[in-house]
C-alpha cells in the first residue's frame, strides 16, 4: 500500500507578482518531483483538485501553483503565465533540492506542461484533458499565440502522455491528434466518461505511477 501524503505546505513564490503554490510529499522519500499546472480559472482550494493532488502525492513530491490572476496569486492572467511556468520548472531544484522532474497539468495547464516538455531537466510531461478554451478564442489571443510559438520547435525529446475523456469537444480532441502527429514519443489514453472524471480514481494513481516510473528511470540514467 502506498504511503499517504504527509506534507501539505502552502508556498509563496516571491516573484513579481507573488504567486501561491502548494507543496505535497509522501512520508517516504520521494523519487520524483511533479510540477503541476492548473486549468484556467481553477484554484488550489477546489475540493476535487485538492483530492487529486493528495492522491498524486502518495508517490510523488508535488508542486502545484495558481497562475497569476487566479486564486490568491497576484497579477493578471495572460501570456506571462507561460514564462512563470518555465521559471518554476527551472528554479525548482534550487529551492527544493534535486529530483527527477515531471511536468503535468489539467485543461489549459495540460498544454502548459506539454509546452515545457523540452525544458532543461524535464524527464517527462503529461496532460489531463488539455484544453485551449482558457487561452482566448481567437488565434491571435496573446496566450494562445504564446503557446503556438512554444510548440514551434523540434520534436519533444522526452516521453509525453495525454489522457482525455471520450466525451469531449471535437476541436479539443483534434488538437491532441495534431500534437501527437509531431511527437514520436507521445502516448494517448482515452478514458470513458468526461474530462472532469479524470480527476477521480483510478486516474490519479495511474498517472502518478507512470510519472514515477518514467522519472525514476531518467534519474537512474543520469547517474
What function would you assign to each model-found segment?
Residues 1-26:
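N-terminal cap/lid segment of alpha/beta-hydrolase-fold proteins
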Residues 76-95:
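Alpha/beta-hydrolase active-site loop
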Residues 105-109, 113:
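Gly/Ala-rich beta-loop-alpha elbow adjacent to hydrolase catalytic centers
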Amino acid at each position: 500500500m502506498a504511503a499517504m501524503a504527509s506534507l501539505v505546505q502552502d508556498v509563496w513564490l516571491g516573484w513579481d507578482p507573488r504567486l501561491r503554490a502548494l507543496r505535497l510529499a509522501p512520508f517516504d522519500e520521494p523519487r520524483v518531483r511533479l510540477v503541476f499546472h492548473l486549468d484556467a480559472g481553477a484554484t488550489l482550494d477546489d475540493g476535487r483538485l485538492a483530492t487529486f493532488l493528495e492522491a498524486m502525492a502518495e508517490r510523488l513530491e508535488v508542486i502545484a501553483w495558481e497562475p497569476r490572476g487566479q486564486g490568491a496569486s497576484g497579477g493578471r492572467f495572460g501570456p506571462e503565465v507561460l514564462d512563470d511556468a518555465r521559471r518554476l520548472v527551472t528554479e525548482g531544484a534550487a529551492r527544493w533540492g534535486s529530483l527527477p522532474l515531471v511536468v503535468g497539468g489539467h485543461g489549459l495547464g495540460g498544454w502548459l506542461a506539454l509546452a515545457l516538455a523540452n525544458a532543461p531537466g524535464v524527464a517527462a510531461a503529461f496532460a489531463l484533458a488539455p484544453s485551449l478554451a482558457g487561452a482566448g478564442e481567437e488565434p491571435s489571443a496573446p496566450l494562445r499565440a504564446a503557446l503556438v510559438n512554444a510548440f514551434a520547435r523540434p520534436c519533444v525529446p522526452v516521453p509525453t502522455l495525454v489522457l482525455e475523456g471520450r466525451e469531449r469537444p471535437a476541436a479539443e480532441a483534434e488538437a491532441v491528434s495534431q500534437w501527437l502527429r509531431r511527437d514520436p514519443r507521445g502516448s494517448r489514453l482515452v478514458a470513458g466518461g468526461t474530462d472532469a472524471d479524470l480527476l477521480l480514481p483510478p486516474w490519479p494513481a495511474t498517472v502518478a505511477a507512470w510519472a514515477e516510473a518514467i522519472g525514476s528511470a531518467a534519474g537512474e540514467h543520469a547517474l
